[in-house]
Amino acid sequence: MFTILPRNVFGAMGGDKKYVAPSDQLTRGIIGTGGIGMSGLHFVSDERCRLVSVCDVDKNHLDNALKKGVEKFGTKLQAYTDWRDLVHDPNVDIVHIATPSHWHGIMAVEACRAGKDIFCEKPMTRTIGEGQKVVEAVNKYGRIFRLDTWFRFKDTFYGLGTTVEPLKKLVQSGLLGWPLTVRISGATGFTWKFYWTGKENLVPQPVPAELDYDMWLGPAPY
C-alpha cells in the first residue's frame, strides 16, 4: 500500500506561488530567437505555460537561446533549424512566431493545420491577402491567434498611467472634440532603423557560415 501526496506538502513551491503540474501546463515553442524572440524566452511569470523548444536558421542565435534556456529553466530546450519540425512537434501547444514578417503568414497557416494555437509578432502579415488566409485557417481549424499588440494591455500605455481601453472610450465619446491632432515621434530604443534604411550602393557580402540564408529568405524574393 502506498499514498500519493501533493507536491506542495513537501514545500516544493515557496511563498504564494502556485504550483501547476506539467500535465496541466500549456507548452510553447519559439520560431526565431533574435532580439524579439529572445524577449519571449522570459515569459515565465505564468506557471500555466512552459517553453519547450526553439528554432532558428542562425546557429549563433540558436546556441544563445539554448544557453539562456538552461540558465532560465535549468533544462535543455529542444532545438530545431527547420520551423516545420517545431510546428509539427506533438509536444508543442502554442507556436510563437518571431521571424521576419515575410514568413508570418505561411507559418501561421501551417501551425493551424498542425493543430497549434499561435502567438505572432507584429506585423501579422505583409499583405491583406496573406492576412485573410490566416483568418481562414484560424476559423477552419478552430485555433486561437493572438497578435502581439501587447502595449494595448499594459497597465501604463506608453507612460500614460492607464491601459488603452479607457483612452479609446474617451476619444469615441466625443468629449475631446473633433478633429484631433496626433503627433508621432520615433520610438525610443528603435533608432537603428533610421540609420539602416535608405542606404544605397551597399557592398555585397558573403552569407555568414552560421546562417541558412535560403531558409531565412523563404518566400521573399530577395
How would you name each of these model-derived features?
Residues 37, 60-61, 154, 188-191, ...:
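Flexible, glycine-rich phosphate/dinucleotide-binding loops
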Residues 25, 49, 179-181, 213:
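Extracellular structured ligand-interaction cores
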Residues 53-55, 96, 180-183, 217:
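Residues embedded in well-ordered beta-strands within globular domains across many folds
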Residues 125-210:
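A contiguous active-site-proximal alpha/beta segment in oxidoreductase catalytic domains
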Residues 1-120, 129-144:
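N-terminal glycine-/serine-/threonine-rich beta1-alpha1-beta2 phosphate-ribose binding loop
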Residues 204-222:
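Glycine-rich, aromatic-lined ligand/substrate-binding cores of catalytic
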Residues 35, 92, 101, 124, ...:
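Short, flexible loop/turn elements at secondary-structure junctions
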